[in-house]
Amino acid sequence: MKVAVYPGSFDPITNGHLDIISRASKVFDKVIVGVLINPEKKGMFSVDERVDLIKRVIKPFNNVSVQSFSGLLVNFMENNDSNVMIRGLRSVGDFEYELQTSLMNKKLNPNVETVFMMTSLEFSFLSSTAIKQVAVFGGCIKELVPDEIIDDVLRKAKEFN
Amino acid sequence: MKVAVYPGSFDPITNGHLDIISRASKVFDKVIVGVLINPEKKGMFSVDERVDLIKRVIKPFNNVSVQSFSGLLVNFMENNDSNVMIRGLRSVGDFEYELQTSLMNKKLNPNVETVFMMTSLEFSFLSSTAIKQVAVFGGCIKELVPDEIIDDVLRKAKEFN
Amino acid sequence: MKVAVYPGSFDPITNGHLDIISRASKVFDKVIVGVLINPEKKGMFSVDERVDLIKRVIKPFNNVSVQSFSGLLVNFMENNDSNVMIRGLRSVGDFEYELQTSLMNKKLNPNVETVFMMTSLEFSFLSSTAIKQVAVFGGCIKELVPDEIIDDVLRKAKEFN
Amino acid sequence: MKVAVYPGSFDPITNGHLDIISRASKVFDKVIVGVLINPEKKGMFSVDERVDLIKRVIKPFNNVSVQSFSGLLVNFMENNDSNVMIRGLRSVGDFEYELQTSLMNKKLNPNVETVFMMTSLEFSFLSSTAIKQVAVFGGCIKELVPDEIIDDVLRKAKEFN
Amino acid sequence: MKVAVYPGSFDPITNGHLDIISRASKVFDKVIVGVLINPEKKGMFSVDERVDLIKRVIKPFNNVSVQSFSGLLVNFMENNDSNVMIRGLRSVGDFEYELQTSLMNKKLNPNVETVFMMTSLEFSFLSSTAIKQVAVFGGCIKELVPDEIIDDVLRKAKEFN
Amino acid sequence: MKVAVYPGSFDPITNGHLDIISRASKVFDKVIVGVLINPEKKGMFSVDERVDLIKRVIKPFNNVSVQSFSGLLVNFMENNDSNVMIRGLRSVGDFEYELQTSLMNKKLNPNVETVFMMTSLEFSFLSSTAIKQVAVFGGCIKELVPDEIIDDVLRKAKEFN
């Protein structure tokens, strides 16, 4: 049974994230979306709110689940019997950051394998940061985030503004 | 009549910005310098101060004007009957950021065209951030910012320091 | 009257090229597609065949024409009263090559301005080289090259194979 | 049963290739090494010689096999009931080439998924080209190619020289 | 007598930094490690603490010393009769930042020469930022920072956490 | 006595090469320009012609000499009591190629240190290839190659054309 972990901030989940989840669910037996609790970064959504948004959009995938975690990612993977981590790649900037991160994780736990997927073309320019900016400035975020959570993002953007 | 918008923070305007403005003024009938009001980022100069500095240095160009704006850039362009945006490119890092931003703008308004110019060689290493650091540390900023505003930048750097 | 030149090998023209031509035709008064005669590189199509393929696909644009040229690009532009060159950008690799080429052209003729457009998302992975490989191996090239010239490319690929 | 294909030229197989094969064999149920027959490129080793070298070094992995193939990669995968392709990533240059290739393959067959692994640190500077150059100039290729095939590479380099 | 300055934040010094110091000490007659006092950035260690950590790990090198400095780097170099600055390069991101910084320094003082060394392979993924994160999350930092200062970093990480 | 080797094809030497030679001559006690004899690549100038052109332009530097060499670069350095190699860096593309080459050289001879200098701004877009193309197409190569050898390059370009 191949269990893969897909870690990130997901503040909020975007169609780019969902694209990776959907494709990974066909390559691995089980996919766990891991929402990182980062004490140094206050996001737009709380960690619990992010987990809730993800739960709603992964319903169509019966081999995908979601949990939040804190501390070292390699420890979270070990606790869930997983030695494969999935990461999306959109650009050269992503590539260099991910190369350094995967080498550090390999140093911390040589059994952990990081596997990458290129984000699908139509989502390759998406980032949670860019989407939050568009939402705060009142732009249309249709096709950028899953339809089920558009209202949640616009409501939060108003509070933020 | 081809109206092009050149958006940015311009905190402060540098010789690299002025180089793009001068070259764009020969390619398009009218150029509007758009100073973005970004509530999340407090700069060295206020937005009004930046607009004033730009007004002083664009005097030689009779087809160039300046305005500040807030909200979505594509809306600002629409209000000024412009469907062409100009951006300068200095490095690979610029390129990737601009690629993602131009694709998001295209998503928000398919009629908007982003056109890029490579910054001239002698200005390719300039950034407002680097110039502010040199000024704060008492370095010489001649040839980095237009001569007309050197004193303004040094005075502001002293307040900042 | 703003005349812009769009130079390249076009061996053959792809939907990525046509995308740039179509968008440039809305930004400039006249666009001249310049097919470079490069004695050092024997392509799949002869230069005349490439010019003919381009003529067929630019019919919908009344402000776009095509010519072949040899020698220095800056001289070809001068002979056509143009001081603006358009180039498409798909990737970091493109960016660096284009940065060096545009700086060399600026050196040869300081009046020449190179203006860049990012290739539209859906064409950002296209290159004449990749399309020729797919055609030679019998793959489907629909949506990769303009419909009008699909048969020409497949016929040439067979000869080539 | 998850079957993954690892395609390449392998002229010759390097320790970087073997590193990817070994790690992939722990992530997927079956791994097929596919040696591409490229009529346009004459290598140092013939395709059959490359297949033979690979056979010798993959003996320790009971879920790994090797075949040569010609034509489109997506067709080769379909004939082997595989919808997952593995590719190694060493550098930014690799990343951009692989991004364009994976998008073209996705266009040719939307069911094909390309999954990437970063080459392990100690092999990240290896390429068949660089190793052939070192061998032709009489340099030491220990730790660059699997021990079992060092003599084959040095013998071929002498013929080549 | 060739005096080279190796400037940085060193918050804290890593094995990547020490690798550059060791190799530079064989190329230049004297190496001065310069710890930059940056009023805008509060680090994990104070500047004095960083100088102390460096003093302990450079003991084996009799031609290497350490000082903190504030203001312009080119002025610090002039005060120490040095016109050569050493910088380490790990990635494309480093390269672009360093290219712009070295061109700005050349502008401020044409006599200053920046010389670069590629970080050794086994340290190429290290950064003070990544190491602090691992330490704060209780991960093992052996082989990431010099053995002599591991306890200092873990103690500081606890305070930080 | 610090002896540094500056290896390359130099087909022909450009002002970018001369810029690196001039700056390196101030950092190291002796600089040897090494012209690589590459059997696989036929250049515009023969190796002897390249050595002659270099001899003419390095006359102002009394600590700079030139030799051609074949085989492994690390062996050439050892024969000249040098453990420092100088390379110029112009772009991200250069950086990645040089990173892999320097790591391979380090593998072949751990005592060899590769030291890099960023090409000066005004020469950052120069390459022997681009200059040869401009010369073959009859463009002006003043300020691109040293004045002393302009006629040699134009004469050779005519033969080539």
Curated annotation (Swiss-Prot), chains A, B, C, D, E, F:
One of its GO terms (cellular component) is cytoplasm. The keyword Transferase applies. GO terms for molecular function: ATP binding; pantetheine-phosphate adenylyltransferase activity. It catalyses: (R)-4'-phosphopantetheine + ATP + H(+) = 3'-dephospho-CoA + diphosphate. GO terms for biological process: coenzyme A biosynthetic process. Reversibly transfers an adenylyl group from ATP to 4'-phosphopantetheine, yielding dephospho-CoA (dPCoA) and pyrophosphate. Belongs to the bacterial CoaD family. Homohexamer. This is Phosphopantetheine adenylyltransferase. It comes from Clostridium acetobutylicum (strain ATCC 824 / DSM 792 / JCM 1419 / IAM 19013 / LMG 5710 / NBRC 13948 / NRRL B-527 / VKM B-1787 / 2291 / W).
